[in-house]
Amino acid sequence: MENLFLVCLVPPTSIVKDVDEIRNYIANEFKVYESLKRPAHITLYNPVKIASEEMEKRFFYALSTAAFSIPFVQLLQNFSSFPQHTFFLDVEKNPGIMDLQSQIKKALAPLDLRTEQQKFNPHLTLAFKDVKPPVFDAIIKNFKDRKFKRTFTVSGFSVYKHIDKKWRPYKEFPFRNPQDNPATRDLFSL
């Protein structure tokens, strides 16, 4: 048994429809299709392979301990890129998303999952992998004067599982009140 999981935020359906419209436009206009193979999402923890049922239980338990958070409003605004390979919607680095990602990373650290976790730079990918430099430049030029702005309330996070060569929704972690977190409760408070 070996399963591949992705921890992420998935915007509401109305925003996903807007994002998919942009991704389809880019695919049709520039002949780059790789991003269409994945659901619209904001990665909170890079994909991780888990090879045993016991480790999978520990993984999901650790994630449940990271779900003690208060809802926050997330802003997606305008377009940006990682030079020459990835074009994306910019995701505001607000305290809510930064704290959530930090909690998830901290909760999973004891599992020693050995995934490459770079500095967290939240984004929602529109085109990557199959984007060659001349096409990348054309996409940037096409979108340089375009604007995009959507907000949504984040009240939990998702885990997707790679099944039959596709990422599929697998488990939801709705936020729980941080005051109910047994790990932070003071024994001597009332």
Locate the predicted segments by residue.
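Basic, often amphipathic N-terminal segments
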Residues: M1-V73, N94-F148, D164-L190
